[in-house]
Amino acid sequence: MNNESKCPFAAAHGVRSPATARANRDWWPNQLNLNILHQHAPASNPLGEDFDYAAEFNTLDLAALKQDLYALMTMSQDWWPADWGHYGGLFIRMAWHSAGTYRTADGRGGGGTGNQRFAPLNSWPDNGNLDKARRLLWPIKQKYGNKISWADLMILAGNCALESMGFKTFGFGGGRADIWQPEEDIYWGAEKEWLATSDKPDSRYSGERQLENPLAAVQMGLIYVNPEGPDGNPDPVASGRDVRETFARMAMNDEETVALVAGGHTFGKAHGAGDPKLVGPEPEGAPIEAQGLGWINSFGTGHGVHTTTSGIEGAWKPNPTKWDNGYFDMLFGYEWALTRSPAGAHQWVAQNVKPEDMIPDAHDPSKKHPPMMTTADLSLRFDPIYEPIARRFHKNPADFADAFARAWFKLTHRDMGPKSRYLGPEVPAEDLIWQDPIPRLDHPLIDAADIATLKAMVLASGVSIAELVSTAWASASTFRGSDMRGGANGARIRLAPQKDWDVNQPAQLAKVLSVLGDIQAGFNAAAPGGKKVSLADLIVLGGCAAVEAAARAAGHVVEVPFTPGRMDASQEQTDVESFAVLEPIADGFRNYQKQVYAVSAEELLVDKAQLLTLSAPEMTVLVGGLRVLGANAGGSPHGVFTRRPQTLSNDFFVNLLDMSTAWKPAGDSFEGRDRKSGELKWTATRVDLVFGSNSQLRALAEVYAQDDAKEKFVRDFVAAWNKVMNLDRFDVK
């Protein structure tokens, strides 16, 4: 029998698979992508829904694991020999590139999920040959199994690499759970080719080199900057501007940036031994027999002395496997001449090098090489802001070591959220401002009777249901599941910058907070035994009480879950600049958009919902409920499809799907008029109308518009509301 005809499906229907067919988005490229709300579904996780990574990690013998990692550093393998017999530089780069994709604008990227294992990151040009680092780690991952995630192991390997070469790290916190499929919610740029320069179509730059938000890298497929300079132009001063912009977008200030660049380049080398054209395809494009290994190099042995990765070739200092101040000794000790590597990349070589500063070859002890610097490295010498910082570190090695230790810890933990999420015996005791610290609970909590009393006080205070709901939503909905920042805990809505955000209606917010503050003060003064309620708790409780009252008005008796225990942060514990990035440019749940963007309002809604870890049904029921509760920013009437506002009804869906209404554009919004009389019935935004326009969302809206869905609507709204109110309650999860 012909092998090609053995499959009955292929014989009957041809040999094309469904993957070769045009997808819906190929036919309709502007179709709203709701898939990002359902990625990482339980069905994709081989460990099962009941797997508790934190519990598993807490059984790990971290000391034994670290000893195995230390041993790995010098266990050079013939299939990928270690430079100078030590893999330290490779593992530092792996950890750095795992964490370094983080960006502050939306909190996405970073090392918190082990996403370097999957496309596109596993095949980014800047991640060349990091597949080898992960293969070197596999025997250790295999040994320790589920006690250590890939995400944690990659970061820990970087720490152990530093420690094995004489550096004292600041600490390590575990707790990064792995994902099992590529992330679809992250926008990496619009370019259609790797490493596209800024003059190419769909550039991420506009105007005077203005980098598109939320991006934090200068070219598609790079972590930060082009080491050869902007678009490959070897200009150290211009490179300094790129370095500053990209590192700032990863939450690093100038001192942290200098420490990271210099500290990271204290170790290892860059690889550009041969013609890049001799390097094979990346892992995702490699043939099946390569078994996921990419960048197979046909130059010489393909590894060791013949390795080509970035195209830049050489080491920065004479002792690349030991922590010392040699990087600054070289940077300031020599003049630098522009040259090209064997791979053709721009780099700089030290002139008139002393014999003791010549660097032994990484694989041939009979050879030595002068130190090299990249264009980006030289920005630390020629940028007017970086240069004095670098010289201070050069003169004060202890300050440099401390700055690098802290910056490395921040780099590798920035996307993990509050310190309470860190696991293991090496978590530093010191609270750091970028961790968004919140005071520890220091008083007895309110009980069920107190909760009932406080609800009654809030509802009798004169603050409306709409105001209570709006305030609670504004407080809780700052949460981002991308980097676990924001949320209601801390009551930072009463502090700068959140109290002044336009979306939070500062005047109304101040009034509500004043009333709630008086209730809090009165209750705490009268409560026995030191019992207290925090303002953070009272803000959420007020919203819960309002939802219950609105449900009663619709004929439904429901109890909204409430768990006390939130605390109030101080202004001193709140970095205003750091929190500024949490200000929403749009919040479709409140029908708010700061300005017109290239991205549609409905896409911004889905993006917000994804950051809130909501499913499409949860997003749908929340929008419908918040509209009728009157939570729109500025009291806008758009989308308030009800004649009984502040009542938790399914009116939004019923009236949206009413075929007696015809919709037409009216400026930036839409008017819904009676098809027969032409009478104006409603106004709406794109966010409102998408629930009738998009086929998937309309299907969900139909469920909630049904005559038998009134109770289900209330029940589902309460569940989704409760989820958002508790997204940052890592203390009770």
From Swiss-Prot:
Enzyme's top EC category: oxidoreductase
InterPro entries in alphabetical order: Catalase_peroxidase, Haem_peroxidase, Haem_peroxidase_sf, Peroxidases_AS, Peroxidases_heam-ligand_BS
Catalytic reaction(s) noted: H2O2 + AH2 = A + 2 H2O; 2 H2O2 = O2 + 2 H2O
GO biological process: cellular response to hydrogen peroxide; hydrogen peroxide catabolic process
GO molecular function, one term: heme binding
Family annotation (SUPFAM superfamilies): Heme-dependent peroxidases
Cofactor note: Binds 1 heme b (iron(II)-protoporphyrin IX) group per dimer.
Active site: 97
Cross-link (Tryptophyl-tyrosyl-methioninium (Tyr-Met) (with W-96)): 224-250
Binding site for heme b: 265
Stretch forming the signal peptide: 1-23
Any one annotated GO CC term: cytosol
Keywords: Heme, Hydrogen peroxide, Iron, Metal-binding, Oxidoreductase, Peroxidase, Signal
Cofactors, names only: heme b
Modification after translation, per record: Formation of the three residue Trp-Tyr-Met cross-link is important for the catalase, but not the peroxidase activity of the enzyme.
Enzyme Commission no: 1.11.1.21
Record site feature (Transition state stabilizer), residues: 93
Cross-link (Tryptophyl-tyrosyl-methioninium (Trp-Tyr) (with M-250)), chain numbering: 96-224
Binding partners and assembly: Homodimer or homotetramer.
Family recorded in the similarity comment: Belongs to the peroxidase family. Peroxidase/catalase subfamily.
Function: Bifunctional enzyme with both catalase and broad-spectrum peroxidase activity.
Protein's recorded name: Catalase-peroxidase
Organism: Azoarcus sp. (strain BH72)
Biological classification of the source: Bacteria, Pseudomonadati, Pseudomonadota, Betaproteobacteria, Rhodocyclales
